Amino acid sequence: MNNQCGTSPIVGFRFTLSPMTSDFVSVIKGALNETDLQNVWRHTDDVSTVIRGRSEHVFDVAKAVLSHATKTGTHVSMSGTFSVGCPGDTMGDNLLDVTSEPANGKVATQYVSSQFALYPLGDLNYMDIIYEEIDFAKARGVFNESMHYASGIHGDIEPVFSFYEATFDRVRAKTSHVVMTVTFSVNSPSHEGRHDA
């Protein structure tokens, strides 16, 4: 076990995929099977799926899984936690010695609404860091709204995930232990066919 924050290069993402359909099992399994997982370590149990590896591959896989799950038009929610530098983490169950080229790459255009909360753990200036990333989202054109306990991010799936990966890596460069919770909603009836911010 690693007892010091920030010494592990492993990024993890534990998520739950929730398709709003009675055929949810095939949607979840189909999304995982259609996603190229060769650059991450993955384990699925009865509650969630965890993927571990290098940052670029973890975000690439997360985006691909969500994209595959939503391509039929089914309303899908994905909720999860990205983490790096946890002092309780282990060096096992990971793939780090792999190519830097993402295995899945760009996905089809898809409007995504999401909410995130950022936790630069152990940093006394954590609020300054959080405000910087909210301003970063506004500059990227993906900021939706402020809300209790989270910030809204929306737009096409590519710039939305590009923002999340960039902001996670930006905070990671400043703070040794970073946690980011995100909930995505795609194909919601309330989106009215939107494709961008």
Residue ranges and their predicted role:
Residues M1-A197:
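Charge-rich, low-complexity N-terminal segments
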